[in-house]
């Protein structure tokens, strides 16, 4: 991928929910919930403090995270849908 977020921003590839239920019922796109889990694919360098020092982000590429339903901005790079948001919009890392 050729996208590098700036400062305290991260790029997340959403993890889509299943197309079918366990019982075999197909879920149409119109009723699917917006994904709230994803994998981090790019991170910014960090945020500057008052002294001008850059503090790196806690999150790293490959982390699976949980974020708010309406967090971030959706973009598309080379056919891949991503969500760009601030690190502080992430609730936590999924183990």
From Swiss-Prot:
One of its GO terms (biological process) is chaperone cofactor-dependent protein refolding. The keyword Cytoplasm applies. CDD domains: cpn10. It comes from Rickettsia peacockii (strain Rustic). Together with the chaperonin GroEL, plays an essential role in assisting protein folding. The GroEL-GroES system forms a nano-cage that allows encapsulation of the non-native substrate proteins and provides a physical environment optimized to promote and accelerate protein folding. GroES binds to the apical surface of the GroEL ring, thereby capping the opening of the GroEL channel. PANTHER family: 10 KDA HEAT SHOCK PROTEIN (PTHR10772), 20 KDA CHAPERONIN, CHLOROPLASTIC (PTHR10772:SF63). Keywords: Chaperone, Cytoplasm. GO terms for cellular component: cytoplasm. InterPro entries: Chaperonin_GroES, Chaperonin_GroES_sf, Chaprnonin_Cpn10_CS, GroES-like_sf. One of its GO terms (molecular function) is unfolded protein binding. It comes from the Bacteria. PROSITE patterns: CHAPERONINS_CPN10. Heptamer of 7 subunits arranged in a ring. Interacts with the chaperonin GroEL. Belongs to the GroES chaperonin family. It is found in: Cytoplasm. This is Co-chaperonin GroES. Its main location: cytoplasm.
């Amino acid at each position: 991928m050729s996208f590098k977020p700036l400062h305290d921003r991260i790029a997340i590839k959403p993890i889509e929910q299943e197309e079918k239920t366990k019982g075999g019922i197909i879920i149409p796109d119109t009723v699917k919930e917006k994904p709230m889990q994803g994998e981090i694919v790019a991170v910014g360098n960090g945020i500057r403090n008052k002294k001008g020092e850059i503090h790196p982000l806690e999150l790293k590429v490959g982390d699976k995270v949980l974020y708010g339903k309406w967090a971030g901005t959706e973009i598309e790079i080379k056919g891949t849908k991503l969500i760009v948001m601030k690190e502080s919009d992430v609730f936590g890392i999924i183990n």
